[in-house]
């Protein structure tokens, strides 16, 4: 399953999101959701404990001036990569 988080993690039910995530799922952080990938942040630690792969949309990171603050452990993807993730997964759940 591809999960997308497009709101600030402070405005999302992260606990509920984690409950429905399964091994092998991907989470793509978009729009204000990219703030969840800030190095040393509370939400990054929580998300990295899940059995998922974590990505950020690079254009949204750049638009927010966060390029130097995103953790190196988080994959950075383009819109083309976003399409590839969509094709990879049979379903998508937006948060």
Swiss-Prot record:
GO cellular component terms listed in the entry, alphabetical order: sulfurtransferase complex
Name of the protein in question: Protein TusB
Gene3D superfamilies xref list: DsrEFH-like (3.40.1260.10)
Role of this protein: Part of a sulfur-relay system required for 2-thiolation of 5-methylaminomethyl-2-thiouridine (mnm(5)s(2)U) at tRNA wobble positions.
Assembly with partners or alone: Heterohexamer, formed by a dimer of trimers. The hexameric TusBCD complex contains 2 copies each of TusB, TusC and TusD. The TusBCD complex interacts with TusE.
The UniProt record lists the keyword Nuclease: no
Keywords: Cytoplasm, tRNA processing
Gene: tusB
Family listed: Belongs to the DsrH/TusB family.
BP term (GO), one: tRNA wobble position uridine thiolation
Protein's cellular compartments: Cytoplasm
């Amino acid at each position: 399953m591809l999960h997308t988080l497009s709101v600030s993690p402070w405005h999302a039910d992260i606990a509920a999101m984690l409950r429905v995530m399964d091994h092998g799922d991907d989470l793509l952080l978009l729009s204000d959701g990219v703030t969840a990938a800030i190095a040393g942040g509370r939400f990054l630690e929580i998300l990295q404990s899940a059995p998922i792969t974590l990505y950020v949309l690079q254009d949204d990171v750049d638009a927010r001036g966060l390029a130097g603050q995103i953790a190196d452990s988080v994959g950075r993807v383009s819109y083309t990569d976003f399409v590839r993730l969509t094709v990879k997964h049979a379903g998508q759940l937006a948060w």
